[in-house]
């Protein structure tokens, strides 16, 4: 079979204006980037303000493994197949970060004959939204550092006289706004700034990957430009020496940060291999951020299409949980159905009986258990791994959403094992189960899945949140740990307990939680496979994101700046003699 790159390069593409017109966009509602991409103007929301909305489908997965489960392949394949059976469908997915592209995970345009094209344009830069987020974020970091420098140099009286600005009395030990870059670079996790003469007061800082920036979350959760401006104004950049918050509005930088992102708030329209529309917007990771594409993209698509297919990152304990408890809480748009992606490989890898070892990813294997051939038939491992799938089925169902299981078929899969899995799923709480061959067959490979999803979406969804706004932060943490992950409880570090008290006292206790934890286990420990039991979730730190409207709980050893592995993806990427990009996947 051709590589994803070859398939994308050989694809016959429509002009993006034709894709937009078929979706229902007017010419003046598209800001063109060549023939393959267009920004969608937010004026379309005003034109379609009274339009009946379509049905939202959320795609999630079992606990991820290094083999890949094919969640984006399924999202794109389902969208293509929905259009093929006469439903008007649009996909809404996140923009890939270049960190994973050059690291382990690779791109995020789908694969095979279920991908967004041109895939190289989507995976590298796209229309520059992530760069805009990086620039706006780092402007905030530069502004707080410069303000600290001048206030320290001049003192209160002279500073206010010369600058005609209020003295903020910044505590250099309480600067909360660090810098970001769209790469995996572990050496930037802990740095000192202001070194040397006349370079400002020294203080400890760090870099996060841009996908973890609060501005990325704001981009994903804003309803319009005015909402984004207000949210950026609420960003907490630092505390003063009295422990009071200093916001981007206080610093006077919120307007400029918004200006940098003025075009980034517009989703980017692309197409799939069969000409289905796809809106790509925002790129928060699901392990260290909330892991879903934008409310704005969903809103536009829902006013133009019968079905909108979106996805949450990683497993249902990660992106799907945050989709429900953060995104839906803010958008008010509940899904009509969910699709849960699994593979035979994933279930065997999650069995706990044997685990594949990948040198590119640290701490993913169970010690002292030898690896076996993941492709070989193994009924014992499959049955043991089904517990993980069944947990995720029940996890989705607890939100009151009908769930359809999609088995992403690989060429090496055993027919007997596939049949056993279908029967096991049909005996579970799932609405239905279908095999997807979208990777190999494109739109023809997920027709049955599309038909079952339509039937599921016709049932009456009884969506419910996991916890109410008014619950205390400690109660929300306990609910997420015990109900969301199956833990026996949660333990807060001394620092986290103090932060919970401080955040509550400052009036932020009503905000939902964004759990930053490993995606490689339902628990906080990546070595615990299957359905872990008898564990306690350790919360080491709580981080306020007042602009985005949630509080991040850092769990275990999760990092907000990834590192490159032993065999990074950039080793395969180059330019050929024709100037074409090769090795991207």
UniProtKB/Swiss-Prot annotation:
InterPro entries reported for this sequence: Formate_THF_ligase, Formate_THF_ligase_CS, P-loop_NTPase
Organismal lineage: Bacteria, Pseudomonadati, Pseudomonadota, Gammaproteobacteria, Alteromonadales
Identification of the protein by name: Formate--tetrahydrofolate ligase
Known catalytic reactions: (6S)-5,6,7,8-tetrahydrofolate + formate + ATP = (6R)-10-formyltetrahydrofolate + ADP + phosphate
Family matches, as Pfam families: FTHFS
GO biological process, one term: tetrahydrofolate interconversion
Keywords, alphabetical: ATP-binding, Ligase, Nucleotide-binding, One-carbon metabolism
Protein encoded by which gene: fhs
Enzyme Commission number(s): 6.3.4.3
Ligand binding (ATP): 65-72
